[in-house]
């Protein structure tokens, strides 16, 4: 057996102690109402925090708000230690690292997550993955597990390269708060390159950080100018920079106009200044930040593509409206021929997003990340998009039937039969889809407390063991050695 195999076997042996729950356990934690059985000697050996907590004369506060202390002799401690500083999932991830030296700070692929609406998401750089990494980083710092903190920083640095700009700004704030200079540098450059104007950044970042972002943009612009060739066309780079600045100014003016519902000014910019609404992401911005009337007026200009894919993920305005669970936005977009079947780069349709949110409500109840969603609005959005998809499917079927009829010869009477069967099958499929839709979205009106109570039931030890068995081995198999 090689050294690597020996270490892997040792790691699994220790991890099995955690998975087996009460086996040889001498300490119990309560996290979000669930019991977690662990072993003091392992925790004390792997973490200075736990070493002081269990054996030191002055254990740190916070892990046990009741103020109970462990006596120096290490005798069994009565009662359960409450943990209020971190969540259950993050606490288990941290314990997995302490026991095995390995961990994967990425949710299981395709696992439904409360703050990820994409069905089939691999959770490599979505909001759910970023939030889990940030929570794990905070826990690692709080409990003094520096190796886990370093691993999480590396994970975040790779995530932000593909994450949304909102998540990048979230990581930027955390990196400043926890003095993570390398992560700060990476995120600040990404925000600077995003082109978002200060008035938009102000919705997410404090003023002092915005000032540093603007300062970085100026330095980057000067550096870019100094690296440009000067031997021919000496003023060419000045013209390019001026053109880029002009486009930025146009986009800022356009967004200010949309914020103030001044669609006429946007129209003048399109006609007189050649503003490209698709490249300026006017419609996604309006859907996310403005009223239904502004979006409708913008669409009626006829200068914006309602199905234009924005950003690296390729989301259309209808994807955004579905994530927002806004029936008004969904309706006005569908009225202007938004495609309910259009897919993102990852193959997700607006209908997929709404079905995932519906599933979370039906089977999980009220969970963090979904509290802002009203079931009635979700039901209405699902009905609108489902109906639009069925109408489009029916129209495509009719077009196919018409083409088949035109290509058929007059003497081929048998062609009527497959035509009849196609309509019959389509009608049958249409009825099934309608039934599926009704079964799904009508249940949204049910009492979500049933799901919540279902989650809270069951034995704590079995819940702990099942949670580790379902997730720990996944994390272990894709982990990193430390």
Curated annotation (Swiss-Prot):
It is found in: Nucleus; Cytoplasm; Cell membrane. Disruption phenotype: Altered morphology of stipules and flowers. Altered abscission of senescing leaves, leaflets and pods, and of petals in developing fruits, even after complete pod senescence; this phenotype is associated with a reduction of cell organization and/or differentiation in pulvini, organs present in abscission zones (AZs). Partial loss of nodule identity characterized by the development of ectopic roots arising from nodule vascular meristems. GO terms for cellular component: cytoplasm; nucleus; plasma membrane. A zinc finger (C2HC NPR-type) spans 113-127. Expressed in the shoot apical meristem (SAM) at the base of the developing leaf where stipules are formed. Associated with functional and vestigial abscission zones (AZs), including pulvini. GO terms for biological process: induced systemic resistance, jasmonic acid mediated signaling pathway; nodulation; regulation of DNA-templated transcription; stipule development. Pathway: Protein modification; protein ubiquitination. ANK repeats lie at residues 249-278, 279-308, 313-342, 346-380. Residues 25-107 form the BTB domain. Induction: Induced in roots during nodulation. Residues 395-434 are annotated as: Disordered. It is a peripheral membrane protein. GO terms for molecular function: transcription cis-regulatory region binding; zinc ion binding. Homodimer. The BTB/POZ domain mediates the interaction with some component of ubiquitin ligase complexes. May act as a substrate-specific adapter of an E3 ubiquitin-protein ligase complex (CUL3-RBX1-BTB) which mediates the ubiquitination and subsequent proteasomal degradation of target proteins. Transcriptional co-regulator involved in the promotion of leaf and floral meristem fate and determinacy. Promotes normal stipule growth and development. Required for the abscission of senescent organs, probably by regulating the cell wall disorganization in abscission zones (AZs, e.g. pulvini at the base of leaves). Involved in the coordination of the symbiotic nodule developmental program. This is BTB/POZ domain and ankyrin repeat-containing protein NOOT1. It comes from Medicago truncatula (Barrel medic).
């Amino acid at each position: 057996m090689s050294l690597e195999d020996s270490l892997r076997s040792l790691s699994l042996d220790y991890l099995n102690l955690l998975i087996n729950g009460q086996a040889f356990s001498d300490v119990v934690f309560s996290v979000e109402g669930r019991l977690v059985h662990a072993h003091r000697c392992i925790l004390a050996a792997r973490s200075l925090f736990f070493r002081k907590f269990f054996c030191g004369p002055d254990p740190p506060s916070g892990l046990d708000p009741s103020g109970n202390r462990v006596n120096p002799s290490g005798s069994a401690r009565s009662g359960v230690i409450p943990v209020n500083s971190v969540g259950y999932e993050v606490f288990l991830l941290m314990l997995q690292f302490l026991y095995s030296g390995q961990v994967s700070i990425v949710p299981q692929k395709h696992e439904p997550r409360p703050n990820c609406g994409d069905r089939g998401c691999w959770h490599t750089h979505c909001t759910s993955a970023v939030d889990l990494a940030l929570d794990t980083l905070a826990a690692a710092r709080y409990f003094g597990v520096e190796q886990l903190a370093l691993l999480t920083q590396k994970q975040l640095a790779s995530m932000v390269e593909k994450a949304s700009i909102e998540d990048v700004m979230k990581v930027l704030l955390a990196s400043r708060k926890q003095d993570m200079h390398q992560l700060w540098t990476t995120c600040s450059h990404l925000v600077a390159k995003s082109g978002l104007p200060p008035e938009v950044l102000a919705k997410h970042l404090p003023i002092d950080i915005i000032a540093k972002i603007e300062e970085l943009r100026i330095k980057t612009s000067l550096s870019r100018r100094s690296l440009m060739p000067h031997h021919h066309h000496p003023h060419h780079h000045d013209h390019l920079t001026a053109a880029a600045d002009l486009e930025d100014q146009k986009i800022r003016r356009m967004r200010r106009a949309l914020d103030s519902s001044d669609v006429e000014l946007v129209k003048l910019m399109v006609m007189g200044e050649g503003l490209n609404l698709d490249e300026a992401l006017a419609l996604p911005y309006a859907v996310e930040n403005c009223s239904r009337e502004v979006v409708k007026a913008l669409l009626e200009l006829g200068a914006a593509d309602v199905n234009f894919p924005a950003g690296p993920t390729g989301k259309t305005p209808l994807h955004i409206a579905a994530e927002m669970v806004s029936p008004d936005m969904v309706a006005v977009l569908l009225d202007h021929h938004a495609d309910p079947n259009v897919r993102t780069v990852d193959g997700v349709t607006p209908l997929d997003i709404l079905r995932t949110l519906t599933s979370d409500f039906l089977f999980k109840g009220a969970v963090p990340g979904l509290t802002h969603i009203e079931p009635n609005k979700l039901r209405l959005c699902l009905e609108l998009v489902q109906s639009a998809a069925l109408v489009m499917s029916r129209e495509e079927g009719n077009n196919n039937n018409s083409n088949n009829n035109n290509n058929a010869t007059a003497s081929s009477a048998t062609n009527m039969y497959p035509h009849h069967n196609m309509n019959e099958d389509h009608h049958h499929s249409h009825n099934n889809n309608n039934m599926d839709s009704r079964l799904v979205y009508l249940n949204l009106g049910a009492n979500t407390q049933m799901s919540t109570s279902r989650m809270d039931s069951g034995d704590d030890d079995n819940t702990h063991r099942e949670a580790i068995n379902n997730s720990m081995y996944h994390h272990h198999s894709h982990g990193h050695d430390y």
